[in-house]
Every structure is written in structure tokens, then in C-alpha cells.
């Protein structure tokens, strides 16, 4: 819908937060440093994996600046991301899930799963 509205609406833009790497970069440059400043003894960072921007951007920053910090993603049952993370391939077709904002039926360009230590299904 948002792509169509951007095409049809004068002066509108489509941000494409799933594949726009500025999403991940913003969290790397801003959110990650803020978290580490506020919690210098952080042991684990847990976040949902939707667009990938938050967890992958913050995760990269934390791995570079506090390598002992674990990064754990949360993904709903029914999303394809858990299988892709655990097995390196898509094992199941996406199913319906009732959690809004996380979980996907495709792998966005913002995903850098190398910064994620573990993933939990909810």
C-alpha cells in the first residue's frame, strides 16, 4: 500500500525501511551508542526482528564496542526468519501470526544475522 501511495501522491516518498540501509545505520550511529552510554554493563540486548534495523544496527555497535554483550532476536512462530537464522535456509512456508511489527515472510536487506547470537520464537 505504501509503495502505491508514494507513486500516486505528489511529493510523497516510500521510505522502504526493510531494504533502506539507512534504517540499520541510524540505529548503529544513534541507538547503539545511547544504549551503551545508559547501560555500560549491559550483558544482553534483546529485540524483535522486524525490519532488522534496530537489532542489527544496535547489535553491530554493541559487538564492536562491548564484544561480551550477547544479542538475542525475538521472532514469532510462523515467521520464516527463525528457520533462516537457525538452519541457514528457509525450511517452512510462512504461516499466520498475531504479533504486529516483527516476523516476516521474506528476508530484508537490513538483516545482518552475523551480529545476532541467538533467536527465540514467541
Please give the residue ranges for each predicted region.
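Glycine-rich phosphate/pyrophosphate-binding loop at beta-loop-alpha junctions
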Residues: 1, 19-120
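PLP-dependent aminotransferase-class I/II
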Residues: 1-9
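A structural micro-motif
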Residues: 10-12, 69
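Short beta-strands and strand-loop turn motifs
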Residues: 14-18
